């Protein structure tokens, strides 16, 4: 979302006077005279009634009024501005319809970008900004990812408690439209806990697991097990279910669902979607150890009919998690490579061996090229001597 600098070609006193007159004319309970206590008191009074303009007026006109209020707010010293900014943010969340909601969103974004980047007030503005963006269905306009979020607060990082509150809000506003982004947010949330307070993050940890399991684009789930709040769930059903998705095959999930059907459903997880994901994860695990698989093997391991094998493999290839070739004539699948479901010591050793082999091959190639180059130089010298 773009934002333009705030600039009003009037003095503060003139702006305050005009705003008071404007809101009084709309029927607000406010004096048209300036306060003797100063501009902060004027702002408190103006912000207290500013939502009266939501009842009438065009969005463009209201945007101009709010812009004027913002232009005054950003002049208030930090130590006296917190209550004013918070009051304004609360008013912006009360827009009665979508067009005005977008006006309020733009106003908050303008305020956010015109506050000093080192101001702790930016956190409060951004929190309300996300709330309004949800109302307007424009969350991705103000939040595109965790890296972007952190860069916004690089000069004044919020406290761990503030970030936890913000991450919970971001999870809530993205979970219905972007599960992948929502899952990343929850992982970041759990990363804010330490060994000392991880035990109080039970609810957050459960939400994180459920979001990751429900996301059709999240397949590498092993890192969740290392998060401290998730470790505190060991022995709980949700942790058992996560462990199945991390390293077990389809039959283990089927058995878990038969034994704990109500639990799975109570978490808002879709059984058919779980089956689809577990089939893909099972296929990946089989591909790790079997460079070649028959259709018959896949029908048994994945619990599908033979005529479903080809469509299934095609869907797997679309994810780019596995590289393979279908051999319809011989009813086989030839595996070229696959992403590992877990990446532990064996995988690091395998990677080390692969890199070592590459190093040796490159050394051989370099030696060969050196020999060829030397031979060519010798030949050139000999020909020169002959002539």
UniProtKB/Swiss-Prot annotation:
Its main localization is cytoplasm
GO cellular component labels: cytosol; eukaryotic 43S preinitiation complex; eukaryotic 48S preinitiation complex; eukaryotic translation initiation factor 3 complex; eukaryotic translation initiation factor 3 complex, eIF3m; Golgi apparatus; investment cone
Q: Does the keyword Cytoplasm apply?
A: yes
In this chain the PCI domain maps to: 181-340
Q: Does the keyword Translocase apply?
A: no
Q: Which GO terms describe its molecular function?
A: caspase binding; cysteine-type endopeptidase activator activity; translation initiation factor activity; translation initiation factor binding
Q: Name one GO biological process term.
A: protein secretion
List UniProt keywords, sorted A-Z: Cytoplasm, Golgi apparatus, Initiation factor, Protein biosynthesis
Domain of life assignment: Eukaryota
PROSITE patterns, per database record:
PCI
Q: What's this protein's function?
A: Component of the eukaryotic translation initiation factor 3 (eIF-3) complex, which is involved in protein synthesis of a specialized repertoire of mRNAs and, together with other initiation factors, stimulates binding of mRNA and methionyl-tRNAi to the 40S ribosome. The eIF-3 complex specifically targets and initiates translation of a subset of mRNAs involved in cell proliferation (Potential).
Q: Which family does it belong to?
A: Belongs to the eIF-3 subunit M family.
What is its quaternary makeup?
Component of the eukaryotic translation initiation factor 3 (eIF-3) complex. The eIF-3 complex interacts with pix.
Query: What is the name attached to this protein's record?
Result: Eukaryotic translation initiation factor 3 subunit M
Organism in which the protein naturally occurs: Drosophila melanogaster (Fruit fly)
């Amino acid at each position: 979302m773009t934002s333009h600098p705030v600039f009003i070609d009037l003095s503060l006193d003139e702006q305050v006077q005009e705003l008071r007159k404007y809101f009084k004319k709309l029927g607000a309970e406010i004096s048209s005279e300036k306060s003797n206590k100063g501009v902060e008191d004027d702002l408190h009074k103006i912000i207290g009634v500013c939502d009266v303009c939501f009842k009438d007026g065009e969005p463009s006109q209201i945007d101009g009024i709010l812009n004027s209020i913002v232009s005054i707010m950003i002049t208030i010293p930090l130590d006296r501005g917190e209550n004013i900014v918070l009051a304004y943010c609360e008013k912006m969340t009360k827009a009665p319809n979508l067009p005005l909601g977008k006006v309020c969103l733009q106003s908050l974004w303008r305020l956010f970008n015109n506050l000093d980047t080192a101001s702790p007030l930016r956190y409060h503005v951004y929190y309300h900004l996300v709330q309004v963006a949800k109302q307007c269905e424009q969350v991705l306009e103000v939040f595109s990812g965790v890296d972007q979020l952190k860069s916004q607060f690089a000069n004044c990082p919020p406290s761990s408690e503030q970030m936890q509150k913000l991450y919970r809000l971001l999870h809530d506003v993205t979970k219905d439209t972007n599960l992948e982004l929502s899952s990343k947010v929850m992982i970041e949330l759990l990363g804010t806990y330490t060994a000392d307070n991880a035990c109080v993050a039970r609810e957050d940890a459960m939400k994180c697991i459920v979001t990751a399991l429900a996301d059709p684009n999240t397949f590498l789930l092993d890192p969740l097990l290392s998060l401290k709040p998730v470790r505190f769930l060991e022995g709980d059903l949700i942790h058992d279910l996560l462990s199945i998705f991390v390293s077990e095959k389809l039959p283990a999930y089927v058995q878990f669902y038969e034994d704990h059907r109500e639990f799975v459903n109570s978490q808002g997880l879709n059984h058919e979607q779980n089956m689809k994901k577990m089939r893909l994860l099972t296929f990946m695990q089989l591909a790790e150890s079997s460079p070649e698989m028959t259709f018959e093997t896949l029908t048994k391991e994945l619990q599908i009919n033979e005529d479903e094998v080809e469509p299934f493999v095609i869907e797997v290839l679309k994810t780019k998690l596995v590289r393979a070739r279908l051999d319809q004539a011989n009813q086989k699948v030839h595996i070229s490579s696959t992403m590992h479901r877990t990446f532990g010591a064996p995988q690091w050793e395998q990677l080390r061996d692969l890199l070592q082999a590459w190093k040796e091959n490159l050394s051989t190639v370099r030696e060969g090229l050196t020999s060829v180059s030397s031979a060519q130089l010798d030949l050139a010298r000999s020909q020169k001597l002959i002539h």
